Amino acid sequence: MDHETQMDDVLSDSDDDEDQQTARPYNELIQLLQVNTEPKGPARKRRKVEYNGGEKRDFVPAANGEEVDAALQGDDDLQEQEPSDEEEEDHPEEADGNHGSDDEEDANDPFETHFSAIDENKLALKIKSAEEKKWKNAKKEISSGLKLVRAIPDVGEGDVSLLPAMKHFSSVKLKKKLCGPATERIPEISGDAQHIAPYIFNYQDVLYGARTTSNSSAMRDILAVHAVNHILKTRDRVLKNNSRIAKEQDADLDLRDQGFTRPKVLYLLPTRQACVRAVESITRFFQPEQQENKKRFLDSFSAADDKSWENKPEDFRELFGGNDDDMFRLGLKFTRKTMKYFSQFYNSDIILASPLGLRTIMDQADVKKRDHDFLSSVELVIVDHADALLMQNWDHVGYILDRLNLQPKEAHGCDFSRVRTWYLDNHARFVRQMIVSASFITPEINSLFSTHMQNFAGKVKVTPVYVGAISEVPLPVSVKQTFSRFDSLTPTKDPDARFKHFTTTVLSSLVRNITSSRDKSSAGGTLIFIPSYLDFVRVRNYFATSSQTTNVSFGAISEYSEVREMTRARTHFMNGRHAVLLYTERLHHFRRYQLRGVKRIVMYGVPENPLFWGEIVGFLGLDPAGVVDAAEGGVRALFSKWDALKLERIVGTKRVGNMLREKGGDTFTFV
């Protein structure tokens, strides 16, 4: 790869600009990019791509769809992924094509006001407020059962107002190419989407915590319209300016219309099948005449649902149905008539990946191969089903988001005279839009709102008003549901406080009932549900070594248990050989077992997913003959003030405040 030639091109192209622009960030960036310009390998065939203002280099890591291929694919395979000589190129004359480039530029278009026509003085003030965490808020509960919190950087300008609902695309500044497909597919924006769409299309950050299986498809389509609209407008602007530069070569033009690298949209998704659904939505609205590598994409990403899962919950089938592999990455490139799958990242417009799949190429063992420059110019981030990503490995999500919009280490064929000023000033993270959808909001997901959502245009958080999972228990008889609050000074001390309360208060009475019972059949059947794996290990070790539990037979299964081990433990528990069964939330998330033999339930902590409450409590009714006795055994759950978010989902929005603040007692019972 001829890095020196590219660097010479970049530096020579930017000499004239440097004489005119002496901004410190620009000079520092040029100095930074002069480092490490030695060739790292043999020169390869390169092709002209009139998109980012110059010649673009090949990207070393493959953006392929196969986990095995990702590890084995060499330079030749990467070269083969490049467009063939016959493939349609990006030429300036495309600006006169059918991409809707005849659309008149509208000064009121959010694309213009957010990315191009920015008042730099106002932008600087808003960035300063965002950096100092000075936000002005407005809250509102709307009739559809949603709570909205909107925040904007506090620069002393008026009050914060909520945007009116959007019911049609008529008020959205869409490319003409998109208007027909969008209005045909979505004639009316309804449900939660009508309240969220105004913020999406006005380029504000969105944290949506009410994702369901019934509304996920509509939200996915709206996000696809937004993503494709952004790609087309970005691409059209660049091609128009390319044409203008070619026609006015003697003019001193200052056309800043792009970032450092080509990728503009990043999707983070939990599974390959989720990627297929997102791509299908994108294709539905872009409507390409040709789709290159589509068969390869479907063969490696899509699969049929498992017919044996017909009795599994609907949300489980949505998440794990089809191809549930969580190791993937995919680049999509758009030309006038074609959409190409498996394009190299530096030649892609949209990148879709799982957190694990993306991190494997960003954080390689060989330091020289580590690369995240392709994320330097991402302007739209879509994180779908964030709660599912939380159950995978949230550290990967944080790793990726921490490396978004950093200034690149290499030039990658960038024409710096075309780069927007706020990129050069290292302010891209304040202009980037982030949209996160989740079935529920946890502290980890909530931290995205405060840490990574720094949009100068503002941000909005949308959460449901919860009735409470305790009121939707699927049992034919009422069951006693008791919540015990324990004191915990800080989140870091919470695990120790919880363990102490469990072993001294809950376990002592539990052991006494088990060991003193004359009827062995009634002595067993205690399920201990533990949300955290670390807590699970601690409790399991205590049961195995403590003198307190010497006479208590128990089984313990987690997401790391082997299938044979899980089958044996479940059988022993059902038959009464194990009086106690320890069971983790992540195991339930991945398996959704129906545990038989449950007569009483102890929740070491309430589940993050409110659906799990009804499913776990429902175990009490799996044996119709003993359902009345099981209902008497009931449920006991431990909580502290640090469990506020998930406790609200279990007991309901109206009840949670009193339970956290009540000074008259620490035990609450619902029947």
From Swiss-Prot:
Basic and acidic residues composition bias: residue spans: 49-59
Biased composition (Acidic residues): 10-20, 66-93
Subcellular location: Nucleus, Nucleolus
Cross-referenced InterPro entries: P-loop_NTPase (IPR027417), UTP25 (IPR010678), UTP25_C (IPR053939), UTP25_NTPase-like (IPR053940)
Chief location of this protein within or outside the cell: nucleus
Keyword NADP: no
An MF annotation (GO) of this entry: U3 snoRNA binding
Entry similarity comment: Belongs to the UTP25 family.
Assembly behavior: Component of the ribosomal small subunit (SSU) processome composed of at least 40 protein subunits and snoRNA U3.
Function: DEAD-box RNA helicase-like protein required for pre-18S rRNA processing, specifically at sites A0, A1, and A2.
Protein known as: U3 small nucleolar RNA-associated protein 25
Record organism: Aspergillus fumigatus (strain ATCC MYA-4609 / CBS 101355 / FGSC A1100 / Af293) (Neosartorya fumigata)
Name of the encoding gene: utp25
